[in-house]
Design a protein with these regions (language model features):
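PLP-dependent class I/II
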Residues: 1-214
Length: 214
Protein backbone atom coordinates (compact mmCIF):
# COMPACT_ATOMS: atom_id res chain seq x y z
CA UNK A 1 0.00 0.00 0.00
CA UNK A 2 2.81 2.41 0.85
CA UNK A 3 4.68 1.59 -2.36
CA UNK A 4 1.59 2.34 -4.47
CA UNK A 5 0.56 5.32 -2.30
CA UNK A 6 -2.75 3.70 -1.41
CA UNK A 7 -3.98 4.65 2.09
CA UNK A 8 -4.50 1.75 4.48
CA UNK A 9 -7.89 2.23 6.18
CA UNK A 10 -8.10 0.45 9.52
CA UNK A 11 -11.57 0.19 11.08
CA UNK A 12 -10.64 -0.32 14.73
CA UNK A 13 -14.09 -0.58 16.26
CA UNK A 14 -12.83 -2.37 19.37
CA UNK A 15 -9.04 -2.15 19.21
CA UNK A 16 -6.45 0.24 20.59
CA UNK A 17 -5.86 2.88 21.55
CA UNK A 18 -9.60 3.43 22.05
CA UNK A 19 -11.80 1.75 23.21
CA UNK A 20 -9.09 -0.95 23.56
CA UNK A 21 -11.51 -3.81 24.22
CA UNK A 22 -8.70 -6.22 23.36
CA UNK A 23 -7.71 -8.69 26.06
CA UNK A 24 -4.31 -10.03 24.84
CA UNK A 25 -1.37 -7.62 24.80
CA UNK A 26 -1.18 -5.83 21.45
CA UNK A 27 0.66 -2.95 19.82
CA UNK A 28 -1.16 -0.11 18.12
CA UNK A 29 -0.54 0.11 14.37
CA UNK A 30 -0.21 3.48 12.68
CA UNK A 31 1.96 5.37 10.21
CA UNK A 32 1.47 8.28 7.82
CA UNK A 33 -0.11 5.95 5.27
CA UNK A 34 -2.70 4.64 7.72
CA UNK A 35 -6.18 6.04 8.32
CA UNK A 36 -7.19 4.75 11.75
CA UNK A 37 -10.94 4.94 12.41
CA UNK A 38 -12.27 4.79 15.98
CA UNK A 39 -15.74 5.29 17.44
CA UNK A 40 -16.98 7.13 20.50
CA UNK A 41 -20.01 4.81 20.70
CA UNK A 42 -18.10 2.38 22.96
CA UNK A 43 -18.40 4.95 25.75
CA UNK A 44 -21.95 3.71 26.13
CA UNK A 45 -23.29 6.64 24.12
CA UNK A 46 -24.07 5.00 20.76
CA UNK A 47 -26.48 7.73 19.76
CA UNK A 48 -23.62 10.19 19.40
CA UNK A 49 -22.07 8.11 16.59
CA UNK A 50 -18.94 10.26 16.73
CA UNK A 51 -16.06 9.00 14.65
CA UNK A 52 -12.42 9.59 15.55
CA UNK A 53 -9.89 9.56 12.72
CA UNK A 54 -6.14 9.38 13.24
CA UNK A 55 -4.37 10.18 9.97
CA UNK A 56 -2.04 12.56 8.16
CA UNK A 57 -3.16 16.20 8.41
CA UNK A 58 -3.99 16.49 4.71
CA UNK A 59 -6.29 13.47 4.96
CA UNK A 60 -7.98 14.90 8.05
CA UNK A 61 -8.64 18.15 6.18
CA UNK A 62 -10.17 16.24 3.25
CA UNK A 63 -12.39 14.16 5.53
CA UNK A 64 -13.48 17.29 7.40
CA UNK A 65 -14.45 18.99 4.16
CA UNK A 66 -16.34 15.93 2.92
CA UNK A 67 -18.14 15.53 6.24
CA UNK A 68 -19.24 19.15 6.14
CA UNK A 69 -20.98 18.41 2.84
CA UNK A 70 -22.40 14.96 3.62
CA UNK A 71 -23.52 15.89 7.15
CA UNK A 72 -24.81 19.43 6.93
CA UNK A 73 -25.33 19.70 10.68
CA UNK A 74 -23.10 17.16 12.43
CA UNK A 75 -23.67 16.87 16.17
CA UNK A 76 -21.24 18.71 18.40
CA UNK A 77 -21.81 16.87 21.70
CA UNK A 78 -19.53 13.95 20.85
CA UNK A 79 -16.63 16.08 19.58
CA UNK A 80 -17.07 18.36 22.58
CA UNK A 81 -16.75 15.42 24.97
CA UNK A 82 -13.85 13.70 23.29
CA UNK A 83 -11.76 16.77 22.47
CA UNK A 84 -10.91 17.50 26.10
CA UNK A 85 -10.22 13.82 26.81
CA UNK A 86 -7.79 13.61 23.89
CA UNK A 87 -6.01 16.79 24.93
CA UNK A 88 -5.41 15.67 28.52
CA UNK A 89 -4.89 11.98 27.72
CA UNK A 90 -7.76 10.79 29.91
CA UNK A 91 -9.30 8.92 26.96
CA UNK A 92 -6.50 6.33 27.27
CA UNK A 93 -7.09 5.91 31.00
CA UNK A 94 -10.79 5.49 30.28
CA UNK A 95 -9.99 2.68 27.84
CA UNK A 96 -7.55 0.82 30.07
CA UNK A 97 -9.10 1.37 33.50
CA UNK A 98 -12.84 1.44 32.82
CA UNK A 99 -13.97 0.10 29.44
CA UNK A 100 -11.67 -2.90 29.02
CA UNK A 101 -12.01 -4.20 32.62
CA UNK A 102 -15.78 -3.81 32.37
CA UNK A 103 -16.01 -6.05 29.31
CA UNK A 104 -13.43 -8.49 30.64
CA UNK A 105 -15.67 -9.11 33.63
CA UNK A 106 -18.74 -9.45 31.41
CA UNK A 107 -17.11 -12.00 29.12
CA UNK A 108 -15.97 -14.11 32.08
CA UNK A 109 -19.54 -14.21 33.35
CA UNK A 110 -20.89 -15.00 29.88
CA UNK A 111 -18.49 -17.94 29.48
CA UNK A 112 -19.66 -19.30 32.84
CA UNK A 113 -23.29 -19.07 31.75
CA UNK A 114 -22.59 -20.71 28.38
CA UNK A 115 -20.74 -23.58 30.05
CA UNK A 116 -23.64 -24.16 32.43
CA UNK A 117 -26.37 -23.81 29.79
CA UNK A 118 -24.77 -26.16 27.26
CA UNK A 119 -24.02 -28.94 29.73
CA UNK A 120 -23.00 -32.05 27.78
CA UNK A 121 -23.79 -30.56 24.37
CA UNK A 122 -20.83 -30.52 21.93
CA UNK A 123 -20.24 -26.79 22.34
CA UNK A 124 -16.87 -25.08 22.13
CA UNK A 125 -16.17 -21.44 22.89
CA UNK A 126 -13.63 -19.60 20.78
CA UNK A 127 -11.02 -17.99 23.01
CA UNK A 128 -12.40 -14.53 23.86
CA UNK A 129 -9.83 -12.02 22.65
CA UNK A 130 -11.84 -8.83 22.77
CA UNK A 131 -14.78 -6.90 21.33
CA UNK A 132 -18.22 -7.66 22.81
CA UNK A 133 -18.94 -11.05 21.24
CA UNK A 134 -18.53 -14.76 21.86
CA UNK A 135 -18.22 -17.35 19.11
CA UNK A 136 -19.83 -20.72 19.82
CA UNK A 137 -19.15 -23.85 17.79
CA UNK A 138 -21.66 -26.71 17.93
CA UNK A 139 -19.81 -29.61 16.33
CA UNK A 140 -22.08 -31.78 14.22
CA UNK A 141 -25.03 -29.40 14.60
CA UNK A 142 -27.92 -31.17 12.80
CA UNK A 143 -29.37 -27.87 11.52
CA UNK A 144 -27.63 -24.90 9.93
CA UNK A 145 -26.72 -21.87 11.99
CA UNK A 146 -29.20 -19.91 9.88
CA UNK A 147 -32.00 -22.29 10.90
CA UNK A 148 -30.88 -21.97 14.51
CA UNK A 149 -30.98 -18.20 14.12
CA UNK A 150 -34.58 -18.35 12.88
CA UNK A 151 -35.63 -20.57 15.79
CA UNK A 152 -33.96 -18.30 18.31
CA UNK A 153 -35.50 -15.23 16.71
CA UNK A 154 -38.94 -16.74 17.27
CA UNK A 155 -38.10 -16.85 20.98
CA UNK A 156 -36.80 -13.30 21.16
CA UNK A 157 -33.08 -14.08 21.05
CA UNK A 158 -30.93 -12.57 18.30
CA UNK A 159 -27.60 -14.08 17.25
CA UNK A 160 -25.53 -13.95 14.08
CA UNK A 161 -25.41 -17.09 11.96
CA UNK A 162 -21.82 -18.09 11.28
CA UNK A 163 -22.31 -18.92 7.62
CA UNK A 164 -22.51 -15.22 6.75
CA UNK A 165 -18.82 -14.86 7.68
CA UNK A 166 -17.64 -17.19 4.91
CA UNK A 167 -18.55 -15.33 1.69
CA UNK A 168 -17.53 -16.85 -1.62
CA UNK A 169 -16.68 -20.31 -0.29
CA UNK A 170 -17.79 -23.03 -2.68
CA UNK A 171 -16.68 -26.19 -0.89
CA UNK A 172 -19.19 -27.78 1.53
CA UNK A 173 -17.30 -27.06 4.75
CA UNK A 174 -19.74 -27.94 7.52
CA UNK A 175 -17.95 -25.84 10.12
CA UNK A 176 -19.34 -22.62 8.69
CA UNK A 177 -22.88 -23.86 9.41
CA UNK A 178 -22.11 -24.90 13.00
CA UNK A 179 -21.10 -21.57 14.55
CA UNK A 180 -22.97 -18.57 15.91
CA UNK A 181 -21.87 -15.22 17.28
CA UNK A 182 -23.55 -13.86 20.39
CA UNK A 183 -23.21 -10.50 22.12
CA UNK A 184 -22.71 -10.18 25.86
CA UNK A 185 -23.03 -6.37 25.93
CA UNK A 186 -26.58 -6.21 27.29
CA UNK A 187 -27.58 -6.32 30.94
CA UNK A 188 -26.68 -9.49 32.84
CA UNK A 189 -30.25 -10.75 33.20
CA UNK A 190 -30.94 -10.53 29.46
CA UNK A 191 -27.64 -12.17 28.50
CA UNK A 192 -28.12 -15.06 30.91
CA UNK A 193 -31.71 -15.62 29.79
CA UNK A 194 -30.69 -15.54 26.12
CA UNK A 195 -27.88 -18.03 26.65
CA UNK A 196 -30.27 -20.38 28.43
CA UNK A 197 -32.66 -20.25 25.45
CA UNK A 198 -29.79 -20.93 23.05
CA UNK A 199 -28.95 -24.03 25.09
CA UNK A 200 -32.57 -25.20 24.90
CA UNK A 201 -32.80 -24.75 21.13
CA UNK A 202 -29.46 -26.41 20.45
CA UNK A 203 -30.45 -29.37 22.64
CA UNK A 204 -33.75 -29.55 20.76
CA UNK A 205 -31.90 -29.70 17.42
CA UNK A 206 -29.72 -32.60 18.55
CA UNK A 207 -32.70 -34.41 20.11
CA UNK A 208 -34.69 -34.11 16.88
CA UNK A 209 -31.77 -35.57 14.94
CA UNK A 210 -31.58 -38.56 17.29
CA UNK A 211 -35.34 -39.12 17.04
CA UNK A 212 -35.16 -39.23 13.24
CA UNK A 213 -32.49 -41.93 13.30
CA UNK A 214 -34.29 -44.14 15.83
Amino acid sequence: AIRHEVPFILDSAYGGPFPNIVFPETENLWDNNTILCLSLSKLGLPGLRTGIIVAHEKIIRAVTAANAIVSLAPGSIGPGLVCAMVEDGSILNLSDQVIRPYYQEKVKQAVTWVTAAMGDLPCRIHTPEGAIFLWLWFEGLPITSETLYQRLKQRGVLVIAGEHFFPGMQDPWTHRHECIRISYAQDAESVQAGIAIIGEEVARAYDESVSKTD
